[in-house]
């Protein structure tokens, strides 16, 4: 059976369904903003370059520093997307991250992390969640494309019902808000960064950054979001749970049938680590794994 052909058909079908639903079905369309409209540089000022009137941002990593930026506003729900091209070449130990995170103790966080590699080995995409300061919910994927070659769209849907990690509009991970399961409860900002993670990121920390290949450059553009801005209100994200927000409405409370097929295919073919099945970490899997 030609799985890639089937996969391609699913991709096209899902893309058509998502466009049709958002434009003609009233589900809403993400708002595109320039970098300066919605983001500020948070660290590594000299290692951040804004291009094309704020439509693209490059982060640079060398031995002196990496760089990062965050949204000016915090949100209590929404759909957040960026198109990203991660550093190429011998990037072992280098981490490119796009994530939502709260501030202060016991933080919540929803992560995309690209783990660099050397000698032509593929970059790993790691997803993770921190809930009230507790992480260790990693799932890792070797993608069906090379994320260093072209821009691809990475999206995070967060609403009162589920968190969905999207790659090019394909759901690769779903975390459901079910009874007894920890779930984000704090306002979160959108962040991106490029940093040295060579104590863990590649080969369990055995591969260190080879600085002779620096600078490493991560590219970001098409800053799309539709979110419930919680700034100026209570820190209670309950204010952002209304179904009047299109990303909280019925069509976003669960995967569609086509999304479910894509989700199952990606996980069976491209996921190479799941914390739920790691008995060295959890003798009894966490509640959300059932």
UniProtKB/Swiss-Prot annotation:
Record flagged with keyword Transferase: yes
The keyword Cell wall biogenesis/degradation appears for this protein: yes
Domain GH16: 22-220
A GO molecular-function descriptor: hydrolase activity, hydrolyzing O-glycosyl compounds
Localization per record: Secreted, Cell wall; Secreted, Extracellular space, Apoplast
Keywords from the named record: Apoplast, Cell wall, Cell wall biogenesis/degradation, Disulfide bond, Glycoprotein, Glycosidase, Hydrolase, Secreted, Signal, Transferase
GO terms, biological process: cell wall organization; cellulose metabolic process; photoperiodism, flowering; plant-type cell wall biogenesis; xyloglucan metabolic process
Induction: By auxin and brassinolide.
UniProt family annotation: Belongs to the glycosyl hydrolase 16 family. XTH group 1 subfamily.
Stated name of the protein: Xyloglucan endotransglucosylase/hydrolase protein 3
UniProt source species: Arabidopsis thaliana (Mouse-ear cress)
Taxonomy of the source species: Eukaryota, Viridiplantae, Streptophyta, Embryophyta, Tracheophyta
């Amino acid at each position: 059976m030609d799985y890639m052909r089937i996969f391609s058909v699913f991709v096209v079908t899902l893309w058509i369904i998502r466009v049709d639903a958002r434009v003609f079905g009233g589900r809403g369309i993400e708002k595109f903003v320039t970098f300066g409209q919605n983001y500020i540089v948070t660290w590594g000022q000299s290692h951040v370059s804004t291009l094309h009137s704020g439509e693209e941002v490059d982060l640079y990593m060398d031995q002196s520093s990496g760089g990062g930026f965050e949204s000016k506003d915090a949100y209590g729900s929404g759909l957040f997307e960026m198109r990203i091209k991660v550093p190429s070449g011998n990037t072992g130990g280098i981490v490119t991250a796009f994530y939502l995170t709260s501030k202060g103790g016991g933080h919540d966080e929803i992560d995309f992390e690209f783990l660099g590699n050397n000698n032509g080995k593929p970059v790993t995409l790691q997803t993770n969640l921190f809930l009230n300061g507790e992480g260790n919910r990693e799932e890792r994927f070797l993608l069906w494309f090379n994320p260093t070659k072209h821009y691809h769209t990475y999206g995070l849907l967060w609403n009162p019902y589920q968190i969905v990690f999207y790659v090019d509009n394909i759901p690769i991970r779903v975390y459901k808000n079910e009874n007894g399961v920890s779930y984000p409860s704090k306002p979160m900002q959108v962040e991106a960064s490029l940093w040295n993670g060579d104590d863990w990121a590649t080969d369990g920390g055995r591969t260190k950054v080879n600085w002779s290949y620096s600078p490493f450059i991560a590219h970001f553009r098409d800053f799309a979001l539709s979110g419930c801005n919680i700034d100026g209100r209570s820190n209670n994200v309950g204010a952002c749970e209304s179904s009047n927000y299109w990303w909280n409405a019925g069509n976003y409370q669960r995967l569609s049938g086509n999304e479910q097929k894509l989700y199952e295919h990606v996980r069976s073919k491209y996921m190479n680590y799941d914390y739920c099945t790691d008995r060295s970490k959890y003798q009894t899997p966490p509640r959300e794994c059932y």
